[in-house]
UniProtKB/Swiss-Prot annotation:
Catalyzes the interconversion of beta-pyran and beta-furan forms of D-ribose. The active site is at residue 20. Pathway: Carbohydrate metabolism; D-ribose degradation; D-ribose 5-phosphate from beta-D-ribopyranose: step 1/2. This is D-ribose pyranase. PANTHER family: D-RIBOSE PYRANASE (PTHR37831:SF1). It is found in: Cytoplasm. Its main location: cytoplasm. The lineage of its organism: Bacteria, Bacillati, Bacillota, Bacilli, Lactobacillales. The keyword Cytoplasm applies. The keyword Isomerase applies. Substrate binds at residues 28, 98, 120-122. Keywords: Carbohydrate metabolism, Cytoplasm, Isomerase. InterPro entries: D-ribose_pyranase, RbsD-like_sf, RbsD_FucU.
Length: 131
């Protein structure tokens, strides 16, 4: 059994496969996922697990050099934005339109669907390198 925090086999596999500049997305229960994008559904019920729980878990193992968030989170969900900023520290944020975020899911290695039920709780993580 693994000793690390990420024990979901699908998430662990995607993280292990990530290269520099590859992307992994995490989102709320309502985010549409394009056909062809690997969807890892960890939602159990409304709110479980939360977006922040899943983000915290993934950040424990994935080296992230940049994140992408929807512009709309600034006004529609400032509490979630504050929680994200607290987790990512000095990692640069690029704000994009939500419609662009949905299109960019086509390029993601995978999308992790959480049980989150708050608006614009979606993020694209751009992989960095550890050297």
């Amino acid at each position: 059994m693994r000793k690390t925090k990420v024990i979901n086999t699908q998430i662990s596999s995607v993280i292990s496969d990530m290269g520099h500049f590859d992307t992994l997305s995490i989102g709320d229960a309502g985010m549409p996922v394009p056909v062809g994008t690997k969807k890892i559904d960890v939602a159990i019920e409304n709110g479980v697990p939360s977006f922040i729980q899943v983000l915290t878990n993934i950040l424990s193992e994935l080296e992230v050099q940049k994140v992408y968030l929807a512009n709309e989170i600034k006004t529609a969900n400032p509490e979630q934005l504050a929680a994200i900023k607290a987790l990512i520290g000095e990692t640069p944020i690029e704000f994009i339109d939500h419609s662009q975020m949905k299109q960019d899911l086509n390029k993601a290695k995978a999308f992790v669907r959480t049980g989150e039920m708050t608006p614009y709780s979606n993020i694209i993580l751009e992989s960095g390198v550890v050297f």
